[in-house]
Amino acid sequence: MTSSSYTDIDTLAINTIRTLAVDTTAHAKSGHPGAPMGLAPAAHVLFSRIMKFNPAHPKWLNRDRFILSNGHACVLQYIMCHLLGYKLTIEDLKQFRQVGSKTPGHPETHNPDLNIETGAGPLGQGIASAVGLAIGKAHSAAVYNKPGFDLFSNYTFCFLGDGCLQEGVSSEACSLAGHLKLSNLIAVWDNNKITIDGATSMSFDEDVEKRFEAYGWNIVRVANGDTDLDGIEKGFREAMSCTDKPTLINLKTTIGYGSELQGTHSVHGSPLKPEDCVHVKKLFGFDPTKTFQVPPEVYAYYKERVAIASSAEEEYKKMYASYKQSYPDLSNQLERILSRKFPEGWEKHLPVYKPGDKAVATRKLSEIVLDALCPVLPELVGGSADLTPSNLTRWEGAADFQPPSSKLGTYAGRYIRYGIREHGMAGIMNGLAVYGPIIPYGGTFLNFVSYAAGAVRMAALNNSRVIYVATHDSIGLGEDGPTHQPIETFAHFRAMPNINCWRPADGNETSAAYYSALTSDSTPSILALTRQNLPQLENSTIENALKGGYVMLENKEADITLVGTGSEVSLCIDTVKTLETEYNLKARVVSLPCWEVFEQQPESYRLSVIPDGIPAMSVEVWATNGWRRYVHEAFGMHTFGDSGPAPKLYEKFHFTTSGVAQRAKKTVDAYKDIPYIRSPVRRAF
């Protein structure tokens, strides 16, 4: 019989995790005790024997990363944070799922003192982010590692459940991970065969192992994840020994292990009943009359294990000091990027345009920006969801990020071929954004950012600097028709907190959009870009556009303010002459490329742009939702588009000088008898 390195103290520690999961959810009268009870052995082995980390410095560079994709099991992560010595107390556990606590109902990134790399909640988002973290490591290692200096050698460990595997985003991300041969990625499948509805057999009976083998993953099996600690450790070690594939560990567990309801969906998403709490504590040798019990020897044991895990940081510091002497340029570059600073004068590389310059589509103007910035910002890592020739996201001289064995590129490459995987791309970029030395951007059609909305929302919630290059932004894309023409898309994202939604009207505004996106340290940005050519406008400057809105054409005697974005700004300018010749009306024109940035300006400035005294009317070939905060009347789209040449579509939907002028005339007439027209910018709150 083989002797085990695990003893009674390990069993006690695991059962402490389980009883804390019971008490934390019971105290909150809310939460998911089942998965934490089932995964307690795997978490114990991972953090006590496998991972390198340091609770005293949670963000040290070469730490192993842990992602809890089945985020409803977050009480497990909070308990481990407490036991391992992160800044999370028993009182914090007692505040689980309470307003303003360190322990919300799903993992969030707002507390840098914990080991939460990125938020997780909607199932599948965590594993997609884990793929991004793994790409981040592979790329950073290829760029910065040198013989004898493994600056980046960490693993990414991801716990995920049956629900994550059923979500489409996990398929997209894991398929790409297999293609990219991300051997530093280890996913642990909590194979307990239970979801909220009941047994997975009701809806999910595919062969997951064969599916992942088809993706190009290595498969490791652990038959008893409930008690076989040696088997669990062996599984991790075997996964770490694989050097050419990511690994899926098929860990068979019992949900709610120790509960009278173990192995059933009843223990998934509700606290245990009081009598069951007593049962669990008696079963594991704890006093059933007490709560939140942690034996002193368990604290002592984890302190000892943490000392071993954190020793890697001290060795790393010594290595980095030598690296800095040997490779000063690379170390200076890395330190600059990690400090979230840009090279001096980088903004001078932004293209600047003057009126009369050639009319160019803003997607092409975006490409010109990338051509200018990517050579001077090595932290920019781009890609596209198989629309590179349309999105124009690959800068001149770019090299692809590919496994070296593919002969298609190297891990040092900075352009990722995401394939037709919009949601996967966005989820992966969330991981890239938090790895460290990377600012990710990814391209697709604006309409298909809707496919990625779940991951975009997580970027906003996580305060991640991610850039979505969203081309073909309206009916102006033409013949592909309404399946590809966004109508309601931007209204959705404009309604989302903490995301900047840019729709530039010309070259200077496009440069401004990129400047804003890059310098918005904790906010993602969407850049909506045209397929059709747009003129370079008279009063457009980068400085003006960086205010989010500004006066493009002033007239102190104006009867109306026309407010446009993107391709409709030039239409508004052209309409001014039509209004004067046909209706004897004078108009001023405002460009409003980014509502969110405009909102950050003082009210006095916003009132100078959209003043009192005359009505304001918006012109935008999208749904009009949200415009009432800036204008009195909104001209937009109220149906889907159509298939045909872009000019014909603009005619059909009346986005012409005559169509805009007619509506402007009606707006002026509607407000002419109102003695004082108040700007919509003036709001009570």
Curated annotation (Swiss-Prot):
Binding, substrate: H32, H268, R363, S390, H472, D480, R531
Record GO biological process: pentose-phosphate shunt; pentose-phosphate shunt, non-oxidative branch
Chain segments annotated as transmembrane: none
Cited SUPFAM superfamilies: Thiamin diphosphate-binding fold (THDP-binding), TK C-terminal domain-like
UniProt keyword annotations, A-Z: Calcium, Magnesium, Metal-binding, Thiamine pyrophosphate, Transferase
A GO term, aspect molecular function: transketolase activity
Binding annotation for Mg(2+): D162, N192, I194
Coiled-coil stretches: none
Co-factor: note: Binds 1 Mg(2+) ion per subunit. Can also utilize other divalent metal cations, such as Ca(2+), Mn(2+) and Co(2+).
Positions annotated as active site in the UniProt record: E422
Cofactor(s) recorded in Swiss-Prot or TrEMBL: Mg(2+); Ca(2+); Mn(2+); Co(2+)
Family label: Belongs to the transketolase family.
Function (record text): Catalyzes the transfer of a two-carbon ketol group from a ketose donor to an aldose acceptor, via a covalent intermediate with the cofactor thiamine pyrophosphate.
Protein name: Probable transketolase
